[in-house]
């Protein structure tokens, strides 16, 4: 079922002073906001534009999942949040809702709303976790630690909701060994689905300045390209529990926004084919390095 990325216009506590100012060092909202979300319009209008957008590219469907991607989509008062969620779920072609948010922006009151909606709709929460290492989270000005993510995931799963996590591969200070070792902590979260994507350095971000000042702290510097990333992703998959569905391995953003992207313009579907081919060559599968089979 096709997901429709939408923008509810909500901000982030790491930008407005709720947690901090300036946002995460790597973040540029424009990089993952589809063109049909720009220029305003109600959520219902965005949905219609999104459906037309995908139909024009041959992606037809009877029903869709609304995906609140941009911003922190639990960061408002409960009345506003209920209005947003119900507007999306009332669309005749929407069969479910995925809410992207931060692990420090969930409460019992919000979980009550989501649990109630889940009785008649598919509801999932996707947390931007980004790293399992507190030193990294602090360095990128994330505004929360990994324990916060552990707690948020556990509370959300206790309500019977599907929970996903988003992680960035290649944040400063993390080696290949750190990334693979961190999969043990990810597995302990017992996520229903997961997204990985490579660090892309966006123009005008704080991390762009950091990259130019000390690129040796980034694994994507010094010749780490598509072959090396393919091998790393295959190793991640082999250490990842097969009970967690992988939704993404690579991101793609408009080129004019990117200052540095070591993987060039390879598309996610092309990269997925490359990874599957490499795993086949290795006679490998998800979780085989940890001896876990899918339930």
Predicted region positions:
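Core AdoMet radical
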Residues: 30-50, 54-78, 93-106, 122-149, ...
């Amino acid at each position: 079922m096709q997901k429709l990325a939408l923008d509810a216009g909500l901000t982030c506590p790491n930008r407005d002073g709720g947690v901090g100012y300036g946002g995460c060092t790597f973040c540029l909202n424009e990089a993952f906001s589809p063109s049909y979300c720009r220029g305003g319009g109600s959520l219902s209008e965005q949905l219609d534009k999104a459906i037309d957008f995908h139909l024009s590219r041959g992606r037809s469907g009877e029903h869709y999942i609304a995906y609140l991607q941009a911003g922190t989509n639990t960061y408002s008062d409960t009345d506003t949040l209920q209005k947003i969620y119900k507007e999306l779920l009332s669309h005749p072609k929407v069969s479910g809702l995925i809410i992207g948010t931060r692990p420090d922006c969930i409460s019992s009151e919000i979980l009550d709303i989501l649990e109630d909606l889940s009785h008649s709709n598919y509801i999932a929460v996707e947390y931007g976790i980004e790293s399992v290492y507190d030193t990294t989270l602090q360095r990128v000005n994330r505004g929360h630690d990994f324990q916060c993510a552990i707690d948020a995931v556990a509370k959300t799963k206790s309500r019977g909701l599907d929970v996903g996590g988003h992680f960035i591969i290649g944040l400063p200070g993390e080696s290949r060994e750190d990334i693979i070792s961190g999969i043990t902590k990810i597995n302990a979260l017992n996520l229903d689905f997961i997204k990985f994507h490579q660090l892309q350095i966006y123009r005008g971000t704080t991390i762009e300045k950091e990259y130019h000042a000390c690129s040796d702290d980034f694994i994507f510097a010094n010749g780490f390209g598509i072959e090396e990333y393919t091998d790393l992703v295959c190793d991640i998959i082999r250490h990842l529990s097969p009970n967690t569905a992988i939704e993404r391995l690579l991101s793609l953003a408009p080129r004019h926004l990117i200052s540095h992207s070591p993987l060039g313009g390879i598309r996610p579907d092309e990269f997925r084919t490359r990874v599957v081919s490499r795993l086949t060559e290795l006679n490998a599968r998800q979780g085989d390095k940890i001896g876990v089979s899918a339930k």
